[in-house]
A protein has these predicted regions:
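Glycine/tyrosine- and acidic-biased, solvent-exposed loop/turn segments at the edges of beta-strands
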Residues: 18-345
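Bacterial Sec-dependent N-terminal signal peptides
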Residues: 1-25
């Protein structure tokens, strides 16, 4: 079994380091630190706040925790605890007071820093997270994050902030699953969105956009219940089109095309039900043909490769002429076929 203090600190520690820009949250005044400052200056004569409330026990001394059934126990016989417990910081200030019903955390409780400022506000019903949880940075009373729960599952909005009050992440949950709009922001760049994504019950669903630090779209994608669906667009950092793709429920369907920065085609290919179909081509930067392949149901029917000067360096499956020779053989040798006229009798 584990001590109570360890359990509380572990839960807080998971989230304390995760924090950019839906608008700053107003800071409360810094009067919360006054109590801690006075304690620090007069620590010899400071009064211990714990142990003054009748029926409230010391969490660390009187209670133990059974993690197998998430129950806090008291006494030699280890019965589920009913009542309140508290802990104090080394400077004598109350750290937290928690209520229990049948060994389960129940109700709203508040934990403070040693400065006297609020660290976290939690809510439980019979040991299950339920309601709003809020974590604060020390001394500033600036919110670090807010999460909402319903019967143990994240439900509703979750939002994370920097110490300056800028949002880093905003998302919504439905019974523990991401649902609705999620916004992620560039770290340390105020009001600069990095990603805007839509979810339906845990699945990517709808528009998915990524932005660079200048606010320019660099990815414009679309999903349908977790699967790629529709047109995907990728862009250079200045917004110039880089690539387009077409998908139907995670299967390639239609043209895939990549562009040089100047706007002309670098390569293109077409898919039908996930298999390459028709002509696929790749071009040099000067627009000359580099590679050409003809597909039928995913199989290569013909293939040609060319060097930078336009000379063919490889061919496969080239169509044959009437005399049985491949037409491209003449092209390779620099000759051209001329039809001979029959003499009239």
């Amino acid at each position: 079994m584990l001590k109570f203090n360890f359990i509380i600190l572990f839960v807080f520690g998971i989230f304390a380091s995760s924090f950019s820009q839906i608008g700053p949250v107003k800071k409360k005044n810094n009067s919360c630190t006054e109590k801690g400052e006075q304690r620090r200056k007069n620590i010899k004569y400071a009064e211990w706040e714990c142990g003054k409330k009748a029926g409230t026990v010391d969490c660390n001394e009187k209670l133990s925790y059974n993690q197998d059934n998430n129950t806090f126990l008291a006494g030699m016989d280890g019965t589920p605890y009913n009542g309140k417990c508290e802990t104090c910081h080394n400077n004598g200030l109350i750290e937290r007071t928690v209520s229990f019903v049948n060994g389960k955390e129940d109700g709203i409780d508040t934990t403070t820093y040693q400065t006297g400022c609020i660290q976290v506000v939690r809510a439980h019903i019979q040991g299950i997270r339920n309601g709003q949880w809020i974590y604060y940075f020390d001394s500033t009373a600036q919110m670090a994050w807010e999460m909402n729960y319903f019967v143990g599952q994240q439900h509703g909005k979750s939002i994370f902030f920097t110490k300056n009050g800028d949002t880093t992440l905003y998302e919504n949950y439905n019974n523990g699953l991401l649902h609705g709009l999620q916004k992620t922001y560039h770290p340390y760049l105020k009001s600069k969105i990095q990603k805007e994504v839509n979810y339906t019950n845990g699945f990517l669903d709808g528009s998915y956009k990524s932005f660079n630090e200048k606010g320019i779209v660099i990815q414009d994608l679309n999903y349908k219940m977790g699967k790629k669906d529709g047109e995907f667009k990728y862009f250079y950092d200045d917004g110039t089109l880089l690539r387009t793709e077409h998908w139907k429920l995670d299967i390639k369907e239609g043209e895939f095309k990549t562009f040089y920065y100047g706007g002309f085609v670098q390569d293109h290919e077409t898919y039908k039900k996930g298999r390459k179909e028709g002509v696929a081509e790749e071009f040099y930067a000067d627009k000359k043909l580099k590679h050409k392949t003809i597909f039928k149901k995913g199989e290569i029917i013909e293939e040609y490769k060319y060097d930078e000067h336009g000379k063919e360096t490889y061919s496969f499956g080239a169509p044959e002429g009437k005399d049985g020779e491949k037409e491209d053989d003449d092209v390779m040798s620099g000759q051209s076929k001329v039809k001979k006229k029959k003499k009239k009798k």
